[in-house]
Amino acid sequence: MGYWGYFTVAESASPLGGLACTRAIPGLTLNRRLSGNWQVWEHPAEPDIEADDLALALAEETGKPALVGFVMDSDCVVIEAADSSNGAWTACLSPKAMASYLAEDGQRLEDFMLTPEQAAEHAVIWATLTGNQVEVAPLADIFQKEADPFAEDLFFTLLRGMSLA
């Protein structure tokens, strides 16, 4: 059995776990600090909050872009990213694995997630809002990759691809 849980990424001089939008999430702990004031916090199970709501709330409270990744059994990751100007967007890492999860409920990947190319375009804009200049092609490659072996590794590869780590 793999990892199930959330990674929450935002920039703040204060600990993310102490912000108004995260205080009510029990078990939220610091996973790592990235460059500048960027932080990754982790919740090892599904919190009682929607990821897009959390990403938007973090973006609004910090005034900076925010990103939430929900890891599903180390197979795939739902990415919810937001900024206060453009709202939220949803994509995934390890799309074949995600499609399998959705198919179990009779759903299709394209009904919920951006394509890897669309996700990469959104990620470039998101990264630009963080002050980083990144290229579409390497990000599209990350969004197309399958977990090998752990999807959470792809999540941190995405953060590096957006010049956060």
For each predicted feature, which ranges?
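Short, extreme N-terminal segment that most often corresponds to the first beta-strand
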Residues: 1-35
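Residue-identity detector for threonine
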Residues: 8, 22, 29, 62, ...
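Generic alpha-helix signal with a bias toward terminal, lower-confidence helices
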Residues: 20-22, 70, 101
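Short, intrinsically disordered low-complexity segments
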Residues: 25-97
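Long, compositionally biased intrinsically disordered terminal regions
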Residues: 97-165
